[in-house]
């Protein structure tokens, strides 16, 4: 098996790492950065940009630039309606599920995420110099079963075998603790990212990493902090100028970028100026937005969001059956954990300064790479056992609309449990197994993650049939459910994946489309390179003709001019095959002319540097080295 890469698929940014040379290495992307914006831009002619190039064009292309797609993964439209309405791009409701509408083409959240994963895959392949097919992908600890399944589907669409889905705080703890030897520690991982918040309590020592509890909120993160600044700016501008910027997608995209920048700056300074010239116009008169935001104002605006981090921390400590004094270290993960008020909240609750020993943007990917090395049994990683938990209670709906629990929250996974149920009415020959996830007592108050029917039950009085329901949750936190009638032996199984909305056939179709798009992207890049090569060759040839026209043999000049025109025509038509042929033709006639020029007249030898190095021929040997030198390097880059 080749390398298993670790990918932190984040709401705002993503990161990829690999275990190499007995240590995890964070891989820089093609732009030279160690994290990649989780942004996909769709530009003219179906071309796609991912990462920084997509983010750079977002202001001028807001309706076709997708960000924060992670917030829609594995969710129904109703569950993500608030986020959908806040986005400048169009999110529609298709059969109860969110879809991103880009000029009539409807993309699932998994497809958009797969485009980001393809970028991370390519980044790793460029670094390793070999194809990558296997990955460990991280998810928020509080992700539901359907959100985990959707993440796995995104990996499959991107052409990756997802070897393991790992909780982000667990990955961070693994990265933090892997070099701590046999030291026994209890740590809290406080992970406040771009779109989600997790808190996990772990104990490790002797190579065993055990998650004691986890809690969180999948709708709390840096995006929400951005939104309070955006609302403050938009409301202020409306009050001052009477113009509603929320109706203008381009203006909202500018506000989004300005809010994010201001939030980041306020982590290191006490005030920042937000200056957005020409944000709007009225009666042909341009309007500018200039505001100063202090850290105190920002903390007041974000007070409720900051306080919302506290209850999950309290619940996690309670579920772990510990007190805050039992915690040896608090690890901060996620870009939003840099907010000073958040750090103050963590310090006050846990009674200790949080550790600054890890990079909050990279530590999750590093942990995922270590998990990949563990699965791959690579040398240098040591004997490590990782015991994670399921974040939410799993159960089924029973008579009266009650949720009956089978697997409690914070149960170590993998885990399997069976319970026996019976029928509710006489002569009932079928039962519906409705699978739920959540902590509320009634079925309707929890998240439905799938259902199936068990038919062919032997008719009998109510309460007589014995239906054995088995929940089997794997190491990825993904659930398999089966129901069996003990009398007839009839059995029905389901792998909980329906709530993601994608069938195996749809995943395969999307995977094929992703591969086609990758090939198309490669072809487009090669086309651009070829056009640039032709453009450079045209420019160089024209300059050479201008400077050396009187030295070129008369019988050769028409051939050069004809070949040059052929290349110009091919370049104008953007025909790659024609450009190749024209370049070869131009090289050929230039070499013939060069050979005659070198023969000279009356025994004189022209300078050898007047040749066309790299254009298909070799530099001529010998010749004068006089002062009257004309350089015309003619390169064909392949």
Swiss-Prot record:
Question: RNA-binding among the record's keywords?
Answer: no
Out of the domains of life, which is the source? Answer: Bacteria
UniProt keyword terms in alphabetical order: ATP-binding, Chaperone, Nucleotide-binding, Phosphoprotein, Stress response
Q: Where is the composition biased (Gly residues)?
A: 613-625
One matching Pfam family is HSP70
| Ligase among keywords | no
Any single GO molecular-function term of the entry would be: ATP binding
Q: Where is this region: Disordered?
A: 597-638
What residues bear Phosphothreonine in this entry?
196
Q: What induces it?
A: By stress conditions e.g. heat shock.
Q: Which InterPro entries match?
A: ATPase_NBD, Chaperone_DnaK, Heat_shock_70_CS, HSP70_C_sf, HSP70_peptide-bd_sf, Hsp_70_fam
Q: What does this protein do?
A: Acts as a chaperone.
UniProt family annotation: Belongs to the heat shock protein 70 family.
Against NCBIfam families, the record matches this protein to: PRK00290.1 (NF001413), PRK05183.1 (NF003520), prok_dnaK (TIGR02350)
What's the name of the protein? Chaperone protein DnaK
Organism, scientific name: Hoylesella loescheii
Its gene is dnaK
């Amino acid at each position: 098996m080749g390398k298993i890469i670790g990918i932190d698929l984040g709401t705002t940014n993503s990161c990829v790492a690999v275990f190499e040379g007995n240590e995890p290495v964070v891989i820089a992307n093609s732009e030279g950065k160690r994290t990649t914006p989780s942004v996909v831009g769709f530009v003219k002619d179906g071309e796609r940009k991912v990462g920084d190039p997509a983010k750079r064009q977002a202001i001028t292309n807001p309706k076709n630039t997708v960000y924060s797609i992670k917030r829609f993964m594995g969710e129904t439209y109703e569950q993500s309606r608030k986020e959908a309405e806040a986005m400048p791009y169009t999110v529609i409701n298709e059969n109860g599920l969110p879809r991103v509408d880009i000029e009539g083409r409807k993309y699932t959240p998994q497809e958009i995420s797969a485009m980001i994963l393809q970028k991370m895959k390519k980044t790793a392949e460029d670094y390793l110099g070999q194809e990558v097919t296997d990955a460990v992908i991280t998810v928020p600890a509080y992700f539901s079963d359907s959100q985990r399944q959707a993440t796995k589907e995104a990996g499959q669409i991107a052409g990756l075998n997802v070897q393991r889905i790992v909780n982000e705080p667990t990955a961070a703890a693994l990265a933090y603790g892997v070099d701590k030897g046999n030291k026994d520690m209890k740590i809290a991982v406080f992970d406040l990212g771009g779109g989600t918040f997790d808190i996990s309590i772990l104990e490790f020592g002797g190579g065993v990493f055990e998650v004691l509890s986890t809690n969180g909120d999948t709708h709390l993160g840096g995006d929400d902090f951005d939104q309070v600044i955006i609302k403050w700016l938009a409301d202020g501008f409306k009050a001052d100028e009477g113009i509603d910027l929320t109706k203008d997608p381009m203006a909202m995209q500018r506000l989004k970028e300005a809010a994010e920048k201001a939030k980041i700056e306020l982590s290191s300074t006490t005030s920042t100026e937000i200056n957005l010239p020409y944000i709007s116009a009225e009666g042909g008169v341009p309007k500018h937005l200039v505001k100063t935001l202090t850290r105190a104002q920002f903390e007041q605006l974000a007070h409720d969001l900051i306080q919302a981090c506290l209850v999950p921390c309290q619940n996690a400590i309670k579920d772990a059956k510990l007190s805050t004094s039992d915690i040896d270290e608090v690890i901060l993960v996620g870009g939003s954990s840099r907010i000073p008020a958040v750090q103050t909240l963590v310090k006050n609750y846990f009674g200790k300064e949080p550790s600054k020993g890890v990079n909050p943007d990279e530590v999750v990917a590093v942990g995922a790479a270590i998990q990949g090395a563990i699965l791959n049994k690579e040398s240098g990683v040591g004997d490590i056992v990782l015991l994670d938990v399921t974040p939410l209670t799993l159960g089924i709906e029973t008579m009266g609309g009650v949720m009956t629990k089978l697997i409690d929250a914070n149960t170590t996974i993998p885990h399997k449990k069976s319970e026996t149920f019976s029928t509710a009415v006489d002569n009932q020959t079928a039962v519906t197994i409705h699978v739920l996830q959540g902590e509320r007592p009634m079925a309707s108050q929890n998240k439905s993650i799938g259902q199936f029917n068990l038919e062919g039950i032997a008719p009998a009085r109510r309460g007589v049939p014995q239906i054995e329901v088995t929940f089997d949750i794997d190491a990825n936190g993904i659930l398999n459910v089966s129901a069996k009638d003990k009398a007839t032996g009839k059995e029905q199984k389901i792998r909980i994946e329906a709530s993601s909305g994608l069938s195996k056939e749809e995943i395969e179709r999307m995977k094929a489309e992703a591969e086609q798009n990758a090939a198309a992207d490669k072809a487009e890049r090669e086309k651009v390179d070829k056009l640039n090569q032709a453009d450079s060759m045209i420019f160089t040839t024209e300059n050479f003709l201008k400077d050396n026209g009187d030295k070129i043999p008369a019988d050769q000049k028409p051939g050069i001019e004809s070949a040059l025109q052929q290349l110009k025509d091919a370049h104008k038509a953007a025909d790659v095959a024609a450009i190749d042929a024209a370049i070869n033709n131009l090289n050929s006639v230039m070499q013939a002319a060069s050979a005659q020029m070198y023969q000279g007249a009356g025994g004189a030898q022209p300078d050898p540097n007047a040749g066309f190095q790299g254009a298909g021929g070799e530099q001529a040997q010998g010749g004068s080295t006089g002062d009257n030198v004309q350089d015309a390097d003619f390169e064909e880059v392949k």
